[in-house]
Amino acid sequence: MRSLPAIYSLFFSICLSAQTYQPNWESLDNRPVPQWFKDAKFGIFIHWGVYAVPGWSSKGNYAEWYQNGLQTNDTARMRFHKAKFGDRSYYDLANDFKAELFNPDDWAKLFEKSGAKYIVLTSKHHDGFTLWPSKEADKTWGFKWNAADIGPKRDLLGDLFKAVRKTSVHAGMYYSLYEWFNPLWKTDKQKFVTEHTWPQMKDLINNYQPDVFWTDGDWDAPAETWKSQEFLAWLYNESPVKNKVVVNDRWGSGVRFNHGGIYSPEYQPDLDFETHDWEESRGMGYSYGYNREEDAWDYNSAQSLVIALIDKASRGGNFLLDIGPDEHGKIPPIMQERLLQIGEWLTINGEAIYNTRRWKTTSQWSAGRRDYKGGNEHITGDWKTGGDIMLKLTVDPDPGYAVKELFFTYNPAQNNLYVIFPKYPDNRKLTINNAELPAGTKISFLSTKENLVWNQNGSNVEINLPEFNPNKIKSPYAFAVKIENFGKYASRPQIKVEYMPGELRPTLSILSDAGTEIRYTDDGSDPGPNSALYTAPVVINKNSLIKAYSFFKNNSEKSLASSVALAEVKAYQWMNALKVSGPKAAINYRYYQPDANVDMGSINDKPDETGIADNISINLKKRKDKFAFDFSGYLKIEKDGLYSFYLESDDGSQLFVDNKEIINNGGYHGTVEKSGRAALKKGFHKIHVVYFDAGGENSLKVSIQPEGGIKQQISALFH
């Protein structure tokens, strides 16, 4: 008889094969993430290339960005390069990238022992150097720029894939769409995409058939330039990996966290995507590429990394942990040690991680403050005072602060709930708040496999743990208990809000699983068994905060009910058009480039430049970064209606219509799009957009969409 996982896998493959995807996000976003990836939870990122030769960056920076620093006047990298390599160019360093100690079978053995279920190797980073024999690389660069023709003179990607495929680990690859200084990219972007990027990607897919295709370097152009939708349609419909490949969301500026496959936060442990598959990546130190500047104390401890894995798994995500081999092909011993330590822990506790899903409650907090300001502690370079945010959140809190004392994961196939705790309680009692277990429920301790005694104390469950014995309890980075045949809960309802044509009041629909009952409130209070019963769509007459939850019709037990879904619902009022005398095309702008840090406070009455712009754009900036804009004028609306506005920016921005804030996309962040609505009468309306860039990459896009119409950038602007 076939096992259930095999049957699920076969069913999943049939479902994927039956679907034909169109080259648009609406269709592509419907492709489910392959089941194997959802079950895997832990992967290894590998950044390896010519940048391993210098293998250097100042602390708090990425060593794989070495070339970019050399060519953008990074004085620290330039000083290091001059001292070590003299007048040699970065391209000449490919001759020193020998990889003479690279043993792919040893790497594969290490990966399997680490407990990782997949790897993602950089087939090509932003410098354009490829780890496989790419004829496009040599052609567009005009010299040998791939590992088969220079340096190692071997197919590093192919050799590693062959070795990994002898193990239980899935083989995946990273691919940078963008190349910083590729001469073809700099002169003809469309030709670069059609004659370089696409042929390389198809070469990789057809010849290496990766289980993961992880793109990056997307920010410099929209998905339309990269022809990302067309490529994904081919990948999903026709490619040899159409049924198994996993992709991420880095397919063009503004796409990340909005479209594509899995969402891919990077050093963003606070981000959470409850309704979308995701994976957070990070290094063991800070750099992804090998950085000889980092010291032992710059690396996260094994406990910190195990807790990071637990944290991601408890919230339904995957953890992609990076290693950076050196130019000789050796993985630094400290990185090997960390991987083996994680593997040791997973050997004991892996069933609490693999094949699990997010439970209705992801963690349980102790008493205390939760307003941690958890920036990236590595950037300070002071491990003694910076601390480790994962450890502070769990085992080493600052005075007065709470910790996540319990994490929960759930295996739906087995109906088992796992409770993971990073700190062994002194009194050997584990308390699960707000849970009621059926009499006779079996609970076991994964470290020793022994059954545990428990009792129901009011609304809480108390579990008696064994005496802590280090001879029996190995790999004490965290501990787990299994609660058998318990944990199935009603799925959280989905709240859908629609505005019918010509209607400013929203229609509310709430969806949930068959066999469940939905109760909801419209005043922001938490719903309960006696709240309003949802039976059919309802029109909402005022601004409301809707909260809804579901529970099984034959069991309203709170611990098995769904988590609460919420939605802010607005009933809009018409905003009347303004009388504007002699409007002229274009919009006013004020430009700022202060000497100090840039934020919303930089926008004041003393601009560095003023003028008229054809559209709301940052193309008029006078320097690469650290600037701000203030746009003000009028927007012409052609007919009465409810309009959606979209504000996409890196960093912060705000949009106002008729002096009313419609969108607040403020703060320091990468490219993020937010939206808001306004009911506008035909005619002119004031529009005001403010924007700042605090440094690094920057972008701003303002779009409008009539109800039922097409989203497009705002063009009808006046002053």
Identify the meaning behind each predicted range.
Residues 116, 120-123, 510-512, 635-637, ...:
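Aromatic-lined ligand-binding clefts that engage carbohydrates, nucleic acids, or primary amines
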Residues 20-26, 33, 37-54, 551, ...:
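Accessory carbohydrate-binding/adhesion or oligomerization-edge regions at the termini
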Residues 487-585, 596, 609-629, 656-658, ...:
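Short, compositionally stereotyped local motifs that mark structural "simplifiers"
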Residues 1-20:
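Bacterial Sec-dependent N-terminal signal peptides
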Residues 19-494:
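Mature catalytic domains of secreted/periplasmic carbohydrate-active enzymes
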Residues 45-46, 54, 58-96, 102-108, ...:
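Extended carbohydrate-recognition surfaces in non-catalytic/accessory domains of CAZymes
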Residues 425, 435-440, 511-517, 648-652:
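Short proline/glycine-enriched turn/loop motifs at strand-loop junctions of beta-rich domains
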Residues 476-478, 541-545, 640-642, 682-684:
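Extracellular Ig-like/FN3 beta-sandwich strand-entry sites
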